[in-house]
Amino acid sequence: MARFMGPRFKLARHLGVNVFGHPKALNRGVKQHKLSEYGEQLLEKQKLRAYYGVLEKQFKKIVFNALKSKEKSEDILVQSLERRLDNLVYRLGFGSTLREARQMVSHGHILVNGQKVDIPSYKVNIGDEVSLRSKSRKIQTYASNFTTIIPAVTYIEKDTESFSGRLIRLPKSVEVPVMVKYSKVLEFYSKN
């Protein structure tokens, strides 16, 4: 699967938000300029895409599915993005960054309900057990990440002894620690 290979810090400065989680990403100045309504919508969309590492084609499908649903579109959008396997691996603390978590999944270090899954965009269902492969538990980085990083969200359950975690329930848009105006993202795509 393709992913963004350009300059990450430059993108973070352009967006005005540290979407990659690296402490030095915003060390240089961020240019302040007044944006039009369209510009604000585009910027919010780009922030959300950059944070989750999703390319435009896949992101567009996720947003259109959220817009079609009868439930609250913001919550459906967040649930679709948060249920991705690479994101759940990051939220559980297996990887220190979303990019590291994505690499762990694609290299086959992660099991879902005891089966190896190497697709980062795999949708995890409620109650599915996400665990680290027994061979991968010997890798010091993964073991230390999992034991030291505490999940900041309430919709996942973490078991440090068995190196696993579960998605307990679907998240609401207000619970997710991503500073994005979801309504602007949905407005951007509802015009097209």
UniProtKB/Swiss-Prot annotation:
Gene3D superfamilies: Ribosomal Protein S4 Delta 41, Chain A, domain 1, RNA-binding S4 domain. GO terms for cellular component: small ribosomal subunit. GO terms for molecular function: rRNA binding; structural constituent of ribosome. GO terms for biological process: ribosomal small subunit biogenesis; translation. It comes from the Bacteria. Residues 83-145 form the S4 RNA-binding domain. Keywords: Ribonucleoprotein, Ribosomal protein, RNA-binding, rRNA-binding. One of the primary rRNA binding proteins, it binds directly to 16S rRNA where it nucleates assembly of the body of the 30S subunit. Part of the 30S ribosomal subunit. Contacts protein S5. The interaction surface between S4 and S5 is involved in control of translational fidelity. Belongs to the universal ribosomal protein uS4 family. PANTHER family: 30S 40S RIBOSOMAL PROTEIN (PTHR11831), SMALL RIBOSOMAL SUBUNIT PROTEIN US4M (PTHR11831:SF4). NCBIfam families: PRK05327.1 (NF003717), rpsD_bact (TIGR01017). This is Small ribosomal subunit protein uS4B. It comes from Clostridium acetobutylicum (strain ATCC 824 / DSM 792 / JCM 1419 / IAM 19013 / LMG 5710 / NBRC 13948 / NRRL B-527 / VKM B-1787 / 2291 / W).
